[in-house]
């Protein structure tokens, strides 16, 4: 058995990136191993599963346990080179028979969250935070194994993640109303490095929860400083705060199809300059501030011609902001207006009122439109 995993790549630009496996794939493999041992007394190791797109990965077992009427198997999650907070966590499945006719029942063990709010794919109250695709994968594999041995698929499957409650504090589960641990996630079973699909999934689920709660106003911020500034104005409930970060497009495109009355986007000057330029992914590796664009904004705001070269040669957007502020020129307001136009264009007429708040590094509001 192998109970270790290689740390996620800390320098992805210097090496070919490795894909990894979702918590859902690990839970499915652990469940297959546990059920097989429950029936036969032997744990398959490694254990292979078929993923939704046909891949057949094999997983080494990090934990085995066989007792009277139950079996347990654990797999250490390898997220490849994705910066995933669950990388290295042990996903444990405990399987035991359920009363005849009950089918397959999922339960949250230690470190796996419980859903408490409406709007998520798993209905509350008290349901284990195991998403639909992992549930289906585990159900199908259990039904196939039971059919092979001529047994009814009446089982209780408890998924546990030691330390999961602490890991969950690094996620948005508490704001989504998922308490006590992490979620068991995945749609393909594969984690693609830096694809950010889990982050965008969190954004979508946050919007779903807010809509289900009847919330009319949500906030997406690029970071904690701008979030705090907006919250000082509105004091929105935690479930109204979306995990936006750099993914303005993830918020806007989902709201296009699932509208909420009002959206406030709050961010630092540089991030919202990129949104004003039309970028929807605001990460520094995927969009850059265009100094020429900033000069156009400054020129329209009244900046003198002799400032053009200084703006074009500036190292950062904040340097441009400070240059214009030093002569009493406001470019934060025009940037906010342009950012709002990008947001409205992306929403394509969806009934969402958009507000933009631009802050400086200290959280002072520079513009609000």
UniProtKB/Swiss-Prot annotation:
One of its GO terms (molecular function) is cobalt-precorrin-5B C1-methyltransferase activity. Gene3D superfamilies: CbiD-like. InterPro entries: CbiD, CbiD_sf. It catalyses: Co-precorrin-5B + S-adenosyl-L-methionine = Co-precorrin-6A + S-adenosyl-L-homocysteine. It comes from the Bacteria. Its EC number is 2.1.1.195. It is an enzyme of class 2 (transferase). GO terms for biological process: anaerobic cobalamin biosynthetic process; methylation. Pathway: Cofactor biosynthesis; adenosylcobalamin biosynthesis; cob(II)yrinate a,c-diamide from sirohydrochlorin (anaerobic route): step 6/10. It holds the Pfam family CbiD. Keywords: Cobalamin biosynthesis, Methyltransferase, S-adenosyl-L-methionine, Transferase. Belongs to the CbiD family. This is Cobalt-precorrin-5B C(1)-methyltransferase.
